[in-house]
């Protein structure tokens, strides 16, 4: 029986590419993101193994409904990839818009916590894996980076969840890319990772024995 991966931020970039790689490897995928049109297009591309689940990751009812629909369709969840996140329009503690800061924190932290909270009951049944998208910005100090601070949270939380999930045979891991060639970064830069590189890392984690 095919395993199932639930992905947030699945409509583009790292999330979409991870979905493609998972389906190639024989997994089913639950695709959760706000963009209904992009999800539909991706699901059409991937076929019967993909289920589009439009919603807002910071909305508990949206996310709970999506998890339930994914389980109903595929029978369970073997891995969850909490990938949704964003940066600031204008970075910096003094220059950034306060509403933009609040929105980023809500997405990068609360959205990730809700994803863990609502998928853990299913992952416990399968002794599954939770993967979080961190960042190189969460592993070193960057002058004034509020975005980086949210990723420091992700790295700390991943370690704590690894300890918790180990008690019942589950696993938690974090992928921490630097600059990746996605719409997240406006400017080109030599040496950028490709989305395929990050997707391959996620697949390595969830398929590890």
Predicted features, each with a name:
Residues 11-12:
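Conserved glycine-rich cofactor-binding loop
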Residues 135:
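Residue(s) in the substrate-gating loop at a strand-loop-helix junction
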Residues 25-41:
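Conserved glycine-rich Rossmann-like NAD(P)H-binding loop of the short-chain dehydrogenase/reductase
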Residues 167-170, 174-175, 189-209:
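C-terminal helical subdomain
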Residues 116, 150:
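Active-site helix of classical SDR
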Residues 91-93, 97-105:
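Substrate-binding pocket helix/loop in short-chain dehydrogenase/reductase
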Residues 54-65, 98:
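The beta1-alpha1 cofactor-binding region of Rossmann-like NAD(H)/NADP(H)-dependent oxidoreductases
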């Amino acid at each position: 029986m095919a395993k199932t991966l639930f992905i947030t931020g699945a409509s583009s970039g790292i999330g979409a590419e991870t979905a493609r790689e998972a389906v190639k490897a024989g997994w089913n995928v639950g695709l959760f993101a706000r963009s209904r049109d992009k999800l539909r297009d991706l699901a059409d591309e991937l076929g019967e193994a993909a289920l589009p689940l439009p919603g807002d990751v910071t909305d508990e009812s949206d996310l709970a409904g999506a998890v339930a629909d994914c389980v109903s369709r595929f029978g369970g969840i073997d891995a969850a990839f909490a990938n949704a996140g964003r940066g600031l329009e204008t970075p910096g503690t003094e220059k950034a818009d306060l509403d933009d800061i609040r929105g980023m924190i809500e997405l990068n932290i609360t959205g990730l916590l809700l994803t863990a909270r609502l998928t853990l009951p299913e992952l416990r049944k399968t002794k599954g894996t939770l993967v979080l998208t961190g960042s190189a910005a969460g592993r070193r100090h960057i002058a004034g980076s509020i975005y980086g601070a949210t990723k420091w949270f992700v790295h700390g939380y991943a370690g704590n969840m690894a300890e918790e999930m180990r008690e019942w045979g589950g696993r938690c891991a974090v992928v921490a890319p630097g600059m990746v060639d996605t719409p997240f970064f406006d400017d080109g830069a030599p040496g950028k990772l490709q989305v395929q590189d990050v997707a391959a890392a996620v697949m390595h984690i969830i398929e590890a024995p």
